[in-house]
Amino acid sequence: STPVTLYLSGLSKGTGQPDTSGMTMVADLTNAQLLFHAFGWKKPAGQDAKLSFVVNKKPGGSTDLDNFQIEGEGLAILGRIALDNDNEITSLSFPKFSFGTLTDMSIEALRRDDGVMQIRAEGASYDARDFFHKLISTDQLTESAKAETDDATNIDLTAKIGRLVGYDNSYATDVDVSLTKRGGELVVLNGRGLLSGQKPIKVELQDNNGSRVLTANADDAGTAFRLIGFYRSLQGGTASLRVNMDAGAVTKTGTLRVRDFAVVGDAVVADVLSDPSSTAVLGQQQQQDAKRKIVFRRLRAPFIAGGGKFQLDDAYVNGPELGATLRGTIDFNKRKLDLGGTYVPLYGLNSALGAVPVLGRVLVGRQGEGVVGITFAIKGKLDDPTVLVNPMSVMTPGIFRQIFDFNSGLPQGTATGAGEILGGNADTERPRKKRRLRPLQNARERRGLN
């Protein structure tokens, strides 16, 4: 907490007692941090802001804060607040609630007799990037996130937003959201909008035999991923997400599925495909084409989120040109990732033998792999990872290829997303180091102890 000095005017002459009919308070909030959890808004300490309001005490003991204003650098909140005898908010009205250059809204709130705070928000535009950043940090899906908010809060919230702004110049229009929390726990969520003003997106909290399941469906997966700052290199496709919100107190489990999409201009993918073993299998021209754009038919990514970490469990992606598997962890607290996987050139032909009983399992290996596969690892800093490729694995079929797997640092059967997939600010380009591509030199590296 940060101490804030209040300056008062309106003292009655000669008595030294407050004139409760019109006391004015002014404060400098520059060094204070302000939070509005319902909208993912935060004013950081150090950002200029001034507070002023007029205190009007009512005969019954309640208080109105009239002409309530918080103004400063890129910030303007104007309206009034009503308090009960215990100085708890009973209602507020902010006809103007704007911050930055992209958020322009009005907010009304009323505490009902049952203690539920009913909030209504409307506006032409809302900058949702801070909200999505908190969501992608994974702990916002877990019970541990409640410690940062009001655990006992009971909220009914509805919002209508003309244009919701996300990362990479992406946006959604005609956004409608209804949300209910009881005791700080999400119990109802319905949201819908149009990605880029065209393709529908829908989010819903469903009841599945007593468990809460969060579902999301988007008819433009690429725009949806860019909107929330998840992954910028995916184009097109349809996406579906299911998250079991009651899987555990700390972690949540889910599955992401995407169909009929392309990956375009991903620098980490280009690094993986730059290995000479890829040239030998794909041919130089197809290798260069794949670096620029790869078409996929299907992605399936089971995951576990919690404790500041995001784990992928035997995720796979496949298409006519290329397939891949991924296992490992992204640690948002340490800003590091550690993943391992196998990419499969000429996936459609390469995996055809998988249909042969017994022999197919031996030759192809895990789901999503093929007869010819090349193991790789992506490790290090989340913003600038290092790519390692093991060319010896191309000569080893199926289940025996696991001998050459890089150690992902997790128990067998867990894995991660990669490179630019998660966590970075998708609006910021960072200088990139050239990835170090090299074969394994010894058994120590083969075990992933590099």
Residue ranges, per PLM feature:
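Solvent-exposed beta-strand/coil patches in large extracellular/periplasmic or lumenal scaffold regions
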Residues: 1-15, 19-86, 91-93, 134-344, ...
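Generic detection of intrinsically disordered/low-complexity segments and helix-coil linkers/edges
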Residues: 35, 120, 125-126, 297, ...
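N-terminal accessory interaction module
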Residues: 92-102
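Flexible beta-edge/linker motif
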Residues: 105-124, 246, 253
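Soluble, acidic/polar mature domains that operate outside membranes
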Residues: 127-135
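Surface-exposed, gly/pro-biased binding rims or lids
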Residues: 344-387
